[in-house]
Amino acid sequence: MNITLFFVALIIALILNYIFKKKNFFLSLTGDVHQKFASSSNVPLSGGVILTLSSFCYLNNFDNFIFVLLTFSIFFLGFLSDINKINSAKLRLILQILIIFGIVYFSSILIFSTKIILLDYFLENNIFQIIFTVFCILIIINGCNFVDGINTSLIGYCIIISLALCYLDLKGVETSQLINFYNLIPILMALFILNFFNKLYLGDSGSYLLGLLFSLYLIDTHQINNNISPFFIICLLWYPAFENLFSIFRKIQFSRSPVNPDTNHLHQLIFFHIKKIFSFNNFYLNTFTGIIINFYNLISIIIAVQFYGDTKVQILIIIFNITFYTLIYVNLISKKIKKSQILSKK
């Protein structure tokens, strides 16, 4: 790991945090309910700013001006959301679609094969290919934003994926050159430490940017190397993807807007459940919840990376993850509903 880069990122983050708190600007209390449900502290949403300022260290595509401009447009959109300049979830969604479409169109980073016969037939059409790619990236970006509600959850998850990709690189497996993960990991580690101690959040700006970069990298990797199963890519991104898709379906089921945040995501239910068991400060419970989730995902990805080219194994891992997620969710939401019903009768 690049120790120098780690300390530089850490120092810059501390300086920015001091400035933001001094100016009472860009703090977590300006965020949505999914950002502050476990904490009422004035924590700077500076993670995305750090990732953007340090991007020249880990992004390898700066020669493509339009690509870089559009990529950082997603950060700026998240930034405007964080400071409540764009409060409409629908408007943010429309702008996300336009930005992602531009990136996909100008970079030619497209999903062309899934090993699902019917879907691959439609993907032979270029227009459908673009629409499907935009949809998938959109799901990941917003899924990353959802899971960022718990300390270390998204940053830790991205570190795990980064380590898995470095492992493939060390084994000589051909992957995308879009991101230098050997430089990104120390930056993420610096953010992880501050996030662990509740001193920094990614905010919408950071979660949007990470979701976009990891999506583009993994799609590009599969374009470059067909020996990597497309289901391995899904395995790496299953958690934010399924979190978002599951959230959309459950909100529609209960006649709620899919684009509005709430506190019924799995990580939030786990937090509330742990809170009932342990009478600790919310800060400790928040971080502990993120560690539990990341430990599970670490085991899942360690297994998946050993069989990166075996589609059958990847499908089994995905099915197990989704089944386990659903069972845990149903159990915890049932307890929450039951408790609400009991309280309403009093």
Give the positions of each predicted feature.
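Membrane-interface starts of transmembrane alpha-helices
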Residues: 88-92, 125, 203, 281-292, ...
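Transmembrane helix-loop junctions in multi-pass membrane proteins
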Residues: 195-196, 221, 246, 304-310
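Alpha-helical transmembrane segments and their membrane-interface junctions
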Residues: 54-59, 286-308
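Extended hydrophobic-aromatic, low-complexity segments
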Residues: 226-231, 248, 260-261, 312-315
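"…together with the soluble PPM/PP2C metallo-phosphatase catalytic core" -> "…together
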Residues: 1-241
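Alpha-helical transmembrane segments and their immediate juxtamembrane interface regions
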Residues: 76-80, 85, 92, 309-346
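Membrane-helix cytosolic exit motif
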Residues: 242-254, 328-336
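Cytosolic, membrane-interface loops and tails of multi-pass inner-membrane proteins
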Residues: 18-44, 85, 246-283
